[in-house]
Amino acid sequence: DRDSCVDKSKCGKYGYYGQCDECCKKAGDRAGICEYYKCKCNP
């Protein structure tokens, strides 16, 4: 939901960029790794 996409905490799980959900992808990536986004990574 929209609120999860503005959550500024670190991702609940670390993983590859391809494993992040769509709103994470829209927020960008860090060296191809889902490390810090404005929403959580997929499990």
Curated annotation (Swiss-Prot):
Record flagged with keyword Nucleus: no
Subcellular localization, as worded in the UniProt entry: Secreted
Alphabetically ordered keywords of this record: Disulfide bond, Ion channel impairing toxin, Knottin, Neurotoxin, Potassium channel impairing toxin, Secreted, Toxin, Voltage-gated potassium channel impairing toxin
Gene Ontology CC terms, in alphabetical order: extracellular region
SUPFAM superfamilies referenced in this protein's UniProt entry, alphabetically: Scorpion toxin-like (SSF57095)
Tissue: Expressed by the venom gland.
Disulfide pairings: C5-C23, C11-C34, C20-C39, C24-C41
GO molecular function: potassium channel inhibitor activity; toxin activity
Family under the similarity heading: Belongs to the ergtoxin family. Gamma-KTx 4 subfamily.
Role: Reversibly blocks Kv11/ERG potassium channels.
Name used for this protein in its record: Potassium channel toxin gamma-KTx 4.3
Lineage of source species: Eukaryota, Metazoa, Ecdysozoa, Arthropoda, Chelicerata
